[in-house]
């Protein structure tokens, strides 16, 4: 059977289910596929197939993630669901599964629990732009309790700078929907309407300002210096001005040639592996770890705050804790830079398996924005992962 071609007739959005263990994230994911499959908009996936999520490696970290796809009348969705709490933390911090929005699942019988809070905080820290809430198990909860849980949730969301008063909270039962109950199914359709309406269309990478990390550098005799890499975002056209940012003082240049697979192009765009010929740049002035970007859109920094996850020993991480002043390498995009770590007040040491907020000072400046992901390495071995939450300098 020939492969079906991917139709781009609807906006594509990446979402996922987040929330406390056993509140019904995977059951809800299965229920969405079941209900939408009845309209021909999804292939039904049972709980077991989602729960046995395959392992993936992202920035040297093994994460179990299930990928499910479905459509509504308005959009095409790629939906991720993780079996374990640690998988969520790793997923959100490494950006392995970038989410444009998330469905926060809360059991009405329990209300917000520690992981509910932690997932909301992480969603805020790693820039998940918006949340919709599914209040699950309402069929077995006391109606008065449901109202209290809703109030508590709105307060909790507001506490972490989400619009708690405006976020849609859909009440339902994922299990009832799985059993084919009409009320149960109606709640799932309501949830998908809320997701369609409340989670904004993502800005496509192509429409963002141009940026390409430099992976390799070579010179063409008589023509100049070429930087190669995969274009991360935006587009670049011939004779456009660019800035070279990171490691050394920022400098300007002009792109006089764009090459891809040995062919010359007029334009390169996000996702392309390209070589850019740069006017007036010496081979010694360009190196791996710099970025070539649209002027004025990104600056080099050395000091930042980050949310990090430190690998357990079983995951190939450190066997021992580390302390204030720890100096590993931070791997940004294409290169390692040494940096020193300041722990939050009151934290004496960090154990393998912990996730926490730290401050970092790098030895050399790197082009960065808030939300940039990195790996923490020691001698080429990954011992952690992180996301820049605030730039200090």
UniProtKB/Swiss-Prot annotation:
CDD domains: EF_Tu (cd01884), EFTU_II (cd03697), EFTU_III (cd03707). Residues 173-175 are annotated as: G5. Residues 10-203 form the tr-type G domain. It is an enzyme of class 3 (hydrolase). It is found in: Cytoplasm. Keywords: Cytoplasm, Elongation factor, GTP-binding, Hydrolase, Magnesium, Metal-binding, Nucleotide-binding, Protein biosynthesis. Mg(2+) binds at residue 26. GTP binds at residues 19-26, 81-85, 136-139. Residues 136-139 are annotated as: G4. It catalyses: GTP + H2O = GDP + phosphate + H(+). GTP hydrolase that promotes the GTP-dependent binding of aminoacyl-tRNA to the A-site of ribosomes during protein biosynthesis. Monomer. This is Elongation factor Tu.
């Amino acid at each position: 059977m020939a492969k079906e071609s991917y139709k781009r007739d609807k906006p594509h959005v990446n979402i996922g289910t987040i929330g406390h263990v056993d509140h019904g994230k995977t059951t809800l994911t299965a229920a969405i596929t079941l209900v939408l499959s009845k309209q021909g908009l999804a292939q039904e996936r049972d709980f077991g197939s989602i729960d046995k999520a395959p392992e993936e490696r992202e920035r040297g970290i093994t994460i179990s993630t299930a990928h499910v796809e479905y459509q509504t009348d308005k959009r095409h969705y790629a939906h991720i669901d993780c079996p374990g709490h640690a998988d969520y933390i790793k997923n959100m911090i490494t950006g392995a599964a970038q989410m444009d929005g998330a469905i926060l699942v809360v059991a009405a019988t329990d209300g917000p629990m520690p992981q509910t809070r932690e997932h909301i905080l992480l969603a805020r820290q790693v820039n998940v732009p918006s949340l919709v809430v599914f209040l699950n198990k309402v069929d077995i909860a006391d109606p008065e309790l449901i109202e209290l849980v809703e109030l508590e949730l709105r307060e909790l969301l507001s506490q972490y700078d989400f619009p708690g008063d405006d976020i849609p909270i859909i009440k339902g039962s994922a299990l009832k929907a799985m059993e084919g109950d009409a009320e149960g199914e109606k709640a799932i359709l309501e949830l998908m309407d809320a997701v369609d309406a409340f989670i904004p269309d993502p800005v496509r990478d192509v429409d963002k300002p141009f940026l390409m990390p430099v992976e390799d550098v070579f010179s063409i005799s008589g023509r100049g210096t070429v930087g190669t890499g995969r274009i991360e975002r935006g587009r670049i056209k011939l004779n456009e001005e660019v800035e070279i940012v990171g490691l050394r003082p920022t400098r300007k240049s002009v792109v006089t040639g764009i090459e891809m697979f040995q062919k010359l192009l007029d334009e390169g765009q996000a996702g392309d592996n390209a070589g850019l010929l740069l006017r007036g740049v010496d081979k010694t002035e360009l190196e791996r770890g710099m970025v070539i970007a649209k002027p004025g859109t990104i600056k080099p920094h050395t000091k930042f705050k980050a949310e990090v996850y430190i690998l357990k020993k079983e995951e190939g991480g450190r066997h021992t804790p580390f302390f204030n002043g720890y100096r590993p390498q931070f791997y940004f995009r294409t290169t390692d830079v040494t940096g020193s770590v300041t722990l939050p007040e009151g934290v004496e040491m960090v154990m393998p398996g912990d996730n926490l907020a730290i401050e970092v000072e790098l030895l050399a400046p790197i082009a960065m924005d808030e939300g940039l992901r990195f790996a923490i390495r020691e001698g080429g071995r990954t011992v952690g992962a992180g996301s820049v939450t605030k730039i200090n300098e």
